[in-house]
From Swiss-Prot:
Record keyword DNA repair present: no
Gene3D superfamilies assigned: NusB-like
Family of this protein: Belongs to the NusB family.
Functional summary from the UniProt entry: Involved in transcription antitermination. Required for transcription of ribosomal RNA (rRNA) genes. Binds specifically to the boxA antiterminator sequence of the ribosomal RNA (rrn) operons.
Gene Ontology terms: biological process: DNA-templated transcription termination; transcription antitermination
Name of the molecule in the record: Transcription antitermination protein NusB
Segments forming a coiled coil: none
Organism: Staphylococcus aureus (strain bovine RF122 / ET3-1)
NCBIfam families: nusB
Upper lineage: Bacteria, Bacillati, Bacillota, Bacilli, Bacillales
Any one of the GO CC terms: cytosol
Disulfide bonds: none
Classification via HAMAP family: NusB
Gene Ontology molecular function, alphabetical: RNA binding
Length: 129
């Protein structure tokens, strides 16, 4: 299955892990999506989810200067997760930043409010510079 689908599953896993009362481990959260999705790139999903969780403070520090009158805590949970995922992938993979940004915009269109993709694109454009 495509990286695009794997990013969707990574997003959903991170969203699940962000729930207030979640005591799931990363491996437990990923195991829920393994059933019925044998074609996903679970190595990539684990890399992305673990990387975001392990580097969350650094990612937030990287993102924060570009939020313009916002704080990371005030962002919608969906936007915060998408920004963290894309920033981690831009900084720690060989995937072209343009591809990562386009995927982040598509995730935002799918999971966030109507025009938030513009905000996500703007923040990521500044990060990739």
């Amino acid at each position: 299955m495509s990286r695009k689908e794997s990013r969707v599953q990574a997003f959903q896993t991170l969203f699940q892990l962000e729930m207030k009362d979640s005591d799931l481990t990363i491996n437990e959260a990923i195991s829920f999506i393994k059933d019925g999705n044998p074609d996903l790139d679970f190595e990539f999903i684990h890399w992305l989810v673990s990387g975001v969780k392990d580097h969350e403070p650094v990612l937030d520090e990287t993102i924060s200067p570009y939020l313009k009158d916002w704080t990371i805590a005030r962002l919608l949970k969906t936007d915060r997760i998408i920004l963290r995922m894309a920033t981690y992938e831009i900084l720690h993979s060989d995937t072209p930043a343009k591809v990562v940004m386009n995927e982040a915009v598509e995730l935002t269109k799918q999971f966030s409010d109507d025009d938030h993709y513009k905000f996500i694109n703007g923040v990521l454009s500044n990060i990739k510079k």
